[in-house]
């Protein structure tokens, strides 16, 4: 396929440029310039803007069972075990969830989805394209992060069981990481001698990739003290971490800069449903981006329906965020945040052909998405 005469916003260069896009076997072959005549499908995109498929770094789409009674159909929280790192989010993903085509129609082509925040350790997130009949068909990575949670949610969900204070949450996470480190060391020391190897433990095995820095802790943290606790524990164990939600990040900008952690801000298009959300602001992503942090904007779908991801970026621009940084916050930055930037997040040769063609600016509410192309296939087409 050749997309002709489009204005290209590649999410790498601040200024858009006119040109053609050549797609072959689901990949971007060239971006920009004048493509030679070829016996290929031609899509005349004159007057349209081309953007990378939007990426949402944090959601529960496919695990929520859209349209079901609240609290009875969701599959993203295990409510009987406060630490369950052995869970894999993709085992709860329903590829025919009604919310998935809605998100795709809004230009969102790749998401990170996985467990909620009821648990101190909830299991692994995965990255997937928003189409297909099964999760296996279009999974990009099976494990992009280990979900952990701080603040009100673990306290609320386990208050009568085992967790009624923030310091308890922190202690439980430390205990699991200490145990996993000990398990890993004993396993490595045993080598090929099975008689010395510790008994197989799914929970401990699940944390080894975290301790080896292969995947980050994906830390749910709204309040500034919770954010700092998450960073403190990550530094104690020398593990990677991303901050999810980062609601009070604007209150600790210097500390976040010093830590150098990627942050995902949202969901902001909601009411302050709990005390730790009182300081949420559309100014936060812009403040953090201006300070040099890698910022993603997230929906936390179903909290905000996935199709409103570009609208959220637009509201951040309205509150002062640089428009190019806002575009990056829903494209290349979330791709980096979840470790799939080699495949998606920008319009560059060699990457997956995930493209949104828009009549206007997708961050403005009256923009009209005409085509959504994923892996070189036109999955959404509007006259």
Over which residues does each language-model region extend?
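Active-site core of metal-dependent hydrolases
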Residues: 72, 89, 184-281, 296, ...
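His/Asp/Glu-enriched, well-ordered alpha-helical/loop segment
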Residues: 66-67, 71-80, 84-86, 216, ...
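C-terminal cap of metal-dependent C-N hydrolases
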Residues: 4-10, 336, 348-383
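Polyanionic/metal-chelating signatures
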Residues: 104-228, 232-241
């Amino acid at each position: 396929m050749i997309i002709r005469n489009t204005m290209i916003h590649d999410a790498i260069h601040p200024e858009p440029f006119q040109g053609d896009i050549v797609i072959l076997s689901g990949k971007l072959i060239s971006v920009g310039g004048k493509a030679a005549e070829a016996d290929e499908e031609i899509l005349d995109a004159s007057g349209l803007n081309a953007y990378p498929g939007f990426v949402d770094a944090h959601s529960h789409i496919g695990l929520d069972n859209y349209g079901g009674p609240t609290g009875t159909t969701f599959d993203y929280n295990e409510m009987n075990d406060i630490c369950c790192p052995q869970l894999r989010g993709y085992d709860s993903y329903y590829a025919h969830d009604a919310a998935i085509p809605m998100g795709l129609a809004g230009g969102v082509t790749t998401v990170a989805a996985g467990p909620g925040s009821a648990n101190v350790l909830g299991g692994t997130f995965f990255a997937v394209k928003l189409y297909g009949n099964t999760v296996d068909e279009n999974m990009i990575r099976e494990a992009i992060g280990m979900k952990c949670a701080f603040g009100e949610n673990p306290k609320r969900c386990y208050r009568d069981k085992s967790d009624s204070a923030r310091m308890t949450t922190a202690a439980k996470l430390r205990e699991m990481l200490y145990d996993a480190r000990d398990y890993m060391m004993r396993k490595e020391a045993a080598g090929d001698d099975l008689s010395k190897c510790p008994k197989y433990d799914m929970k401990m095995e699940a944390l080894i990739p975290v301790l080896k820095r292969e995947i980050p802790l994906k830390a749910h943290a709204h309040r500034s003290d919770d954010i700092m606790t998450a960073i403190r524990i990550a530094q104690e164990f020398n593990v990677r971490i991303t901050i999810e939600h980062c609601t009070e990040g604007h209150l600790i900008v210097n500390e976040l800069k010093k830590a150098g952690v990627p942050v995902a801000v949202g969901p902001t298009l909601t009411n302050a449903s709990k005390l730790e959300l009182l300081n949420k602001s559309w100014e936060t992503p812009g403040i953090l981006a201006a300070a040099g942090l890698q910022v993603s904007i997230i929906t936390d779908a179903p909290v905000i329906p996935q199709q409103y991801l570009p609208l959220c970026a637009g509201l951040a621009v309205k509150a002062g965020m640089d428009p190019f940084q806002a575009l990056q916050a829903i494209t290349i930055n979330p791709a980096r945040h979840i470790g799939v930037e080699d495949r998606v997040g920008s319009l560059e040769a060699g990457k997956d052909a995930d493209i949104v063609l828009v009549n206007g600016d997708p961050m403005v509410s009256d923009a009209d998405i005409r085509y959504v192309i994923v892996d070189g296939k036109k999955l959404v087409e509007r006259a």
